[in-house]
Amino acid sequence: MSEREKITIENIVASTSLAEHLDLSRIALALDGSEYEPEQFPGLIYRLQDPKTAVLIFRSGKVNCTGAKNIEDVKRTIKIIIDKLKAANIEVYDDPDIIVQNIVAVYDLESELNLTDIAMSLGLENVEYEPEQFPGLVYRVEEPRVVLLLFGSGKVVCTGAKEESEIEQAVIKVKKELQKVGLI
């Protein structure tokens, strides 16, 4: 099993722009089940069941999609929103650029970790480890630019990636560094 196959994507956050300006009150009527309370939050919230995602739509035309487990679900979500808005005669772009903002993934090193030893070996300039504050070790990888949270159980959470390949690179990198110093 490759490293990529052992990585589980938990959440992809992506953004796009559907128009220069959107009338959220009108969209709230067009999207059944949407939540729009401008006195509470400036955006409209719309949750989909398939794929199981949520979108935040703003007056500026900006849209954030969250909850996707893969990029195809992000694309499907945006397409569904576009189709529903067009069906309600709301003008939106046909094929907007989608920008991945963050990918959160988990990985299991399949070995218990001594986080104190790891904190010393990875170098204090890239590591935060305060077990009284948080049970995980925060490791800021410089290339690719992601953050890994390492836990004593061997579980690793990766955040800050823009592409799936960055997660795989970071996992391979930390595994090599820990193997080099005999910590896994």
Swiss-Prot record:
Sequence repeat ranges per the UniProt record: 9-85, 100-178
Family from the record: Belongs to the TBP family.
GO molecular function: DNA binding; DNA-binding transcription factor activity
Gene name per UniProt: tbp
SUPFAM superfamilies in the cross-refs: TATA-box binding protein-like
Name of this protein: TATA-box-binding protein
Free-text function comment from the UniProt entry: General factor that plays a role in the activation of archaeal genes transcribed by RNA polymerase. Binds specifically to the TATA box promoter element which lies close to the position of transcription initiation.
Species of the source: Thermoplasma volcanium (strain ATCC 51530 / DSM 4299 / JCM 9571 / NBRC 15438 / GSS1)
InterPro entries: TBP (IPR000814), TBP_archaea (IPR033711), TBP_CS (IPR030491), TBP_dom_sf (IPR012295)
GO BP of this protein: DNA-templated transcription initiation
Gene3D superfamilies: TATA-Binding Protein
Pfam family, one: TBP
UniProtKB keywords: DNA-binding, Repeat, Transcription, Transcription regulation
